[in-house]
């Protein structure tokens, strides 16, 4: 339940060798936090959050999200599916994605785009899926496809 409190989980991957060398050199002489520049202030962030909160979600999208969540609870390789808190996170992130896409309403593609990042850390997979090396990204993709094909 601790991981359920985080909205999303992103995997940045590892830097290539040249970038790793650059990172080590930069950090050897100075604190990298001294180079951080603000790209947005507190009031602008709050305003964007309010704008995203006002994005329209149709009943069809709520139903679509509910079906995806339900599939996580029914999937044979998932021991523990998405909670109501997770469903709310899907909705919030889909609204933000719609806003960033220049729309004032959510479409299924918004939900699909954020689904893996919002959900992969929230599910607990069965031990047999780990043995078979099935990862959560594959399971999330399969769930989206199964709902699309209904």
Residue ranges and their predicted role:
Residues 12, 53-57, 127, 131, ...:
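A general boundary/transition motif marking the beginning of the first structured unit of a protein
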Residues 1-53, 59-67:
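Conserved AAA+ ATPase core "coupling" helix
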Residues 72-150:
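C-terminal engagement/docking regions of AAA+ P-loop ATPases
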Residues 16, 40-41, 58, 83, ...:
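Helix N-cap and loop-to-helix transition residues
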């Amino acid at each position: 339940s601790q991981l359920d409190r985080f909205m999303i989980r992103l995997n940045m991957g590892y830097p290539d060798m040249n970038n790793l060398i650059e990172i080590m050199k930069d950090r050897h002489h100075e604190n990298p936090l001294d180079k951080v520049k603000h790209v947005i202030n507190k009031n602008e962030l709050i305003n964007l959050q309010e704008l995203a909160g006002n994005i329209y979600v149709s009943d069809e999208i709520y139903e679509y999200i509910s079906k995806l969540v339900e599939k996580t609870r029914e999937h044979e390789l998932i021991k523990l599916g998405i909670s109501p808190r997770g469903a709310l996170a899907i909705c919030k992130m889909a609204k933000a994605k719609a806003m960033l896409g220049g729309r004032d309403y959510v479409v299924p593609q918004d939900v699909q785009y954020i689904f893996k990042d919002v959900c992969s850390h929230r599910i607990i997979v069965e031990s047999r899926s780990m043995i078979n090396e099935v990862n959560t990204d594959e399971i999330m993709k399969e769930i989206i496809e199964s709902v699309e094909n209904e």
